[in-house]
Curated annotation (Swiss-Prot):
Similarity comment: Belongs to the ripply family.
Record's compositionally biased regions (Pro residues): 25-39
Biased composition (Acidic residues): 111-128
Domain of life: Eukaryota
Region Disordered, annotated ranges: 1-72, 110-190
Protein name per its UniProtKB record: Protein ripply3
Biological source species: Homo sapiens
Length: 190
């Protein structure tokens, strides 16, 4: 092919294909460690700022769906749906799934404190939940006899197991027959 024909073919190909190698006036996209930070839709670019300021994009031929971080419905990402803390239990039961299913874009539900939650929590007494992990059941019971030095001090941590079957130090189950939790020797033969 002649050089002039090759140049014409390259021009024609450049119109149909937008590969970086076909368009010498555009630099190829950066690759490797010198490339800029990855695109994050929640960070505004200069083009997004212009769109927000003037109401129209910098390029008149830009498509709404491909320009900037606004979605097809005009939402700025990430989208957060705010619900009051008083509605948290209702959300956990059923409505949260329905809210997210009916929302047109990917969203995150954030709960915020509302006044009804504060007044309700002040009126209620604190609920007694399970004991903290670092406390032994004897300490939670509050009985002096099971406290340090009391008559219940020789019992295992797991109150359901008595000295006949014993229990290992963490209450994980009975020890093998003849094994003492005090470190004594086993009288059975192996």
């Amino acid at each position: 092919m002649e050089p002039e024909a090759a140049a014409g073919a390259r021009k024609a190909r450049g119109r149909g294909c937008h590969c970086p190698g076909d368009a010498p006036w555009r630099p190829p996209p950066p690759r490797g460690p010198e490339s800029p930070a990855p695109w994050r839709p929640w960070i505004q670019t200069p083009g997004d700022a212009e769109l927000t300021r003037t109401g129209r994009p910098l390029e008149p031929r830009a498509d709404q769906h491909t320009f900037g971080s606004k979605g097809a419905f005009g939402f700025q990402h990430p989208v957060r749906v705010y619900l009051p803390m008083s509605k948290r239990q209702e959300y956990l039961r059923s409505s949260g799934e329905q809210v997210l299913a009916s929302f047109p874009v990917q969203a995150t539900i954030d709960f915020y404190d509302d006044e009804s939650t504060e007044s309700a929590s002040e009126a209620e007494e604190p609920e007694e939940g399970p004991p903290p992990l670092h406390l032994l059941p004897q300490e939670v019971g509050g009985r002096q006899e099971n406290g340090p030095g009391g008559k219940g001090r020789d019992q295992g941590i797991n109150q359901g197991q008595r000295s006949s079957g014993g229990g290992d130090h963490w209450g994980e189950g009975p020890l093998p027959q003849g094994v003492s939790s005090r470190g004594g020797k086993c009288s059975s033969s192996k």
